[in-house]
């Protein structure tokens, strides 16, 4: 997957988990209403979408779709 595809996937997951279709690629998950439980849900969905087990702190360290996609892409 390209980083752009990963970013679009993560953005869609953030929008669905947070129930906010207006989020952009630079939206902070937590500033947009996310909490730790929703973050764990989102991390699991992202992992399923990219076919990897992801660290549970991913969104805490990279809270925007753009930064999160870069981190996931760097994992290979």
Feature map (PLM): residue ranges:
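Phosphopantetheine-dependent thiolation modules in NRPS/PKS and related acyl-activating systems
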Residues: 1-76
């Amino acid at each position: 997957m390209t980083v752009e595809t990963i970013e679009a996937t993560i953005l869609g997951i953030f929008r669905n988990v947070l129930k906010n279709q207006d989020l952009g690629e630079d939206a902070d998950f937590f500033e947009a209403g996310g909490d730790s439980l929703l973050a764990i849900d989102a991390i699991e969905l992202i992992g399923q979408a990219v076919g990897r087990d992801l660290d549970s702190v991913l969104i805490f360290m990279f809270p925007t779709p753009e930064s999160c996609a870069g981190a996931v892409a760097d994992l290979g």
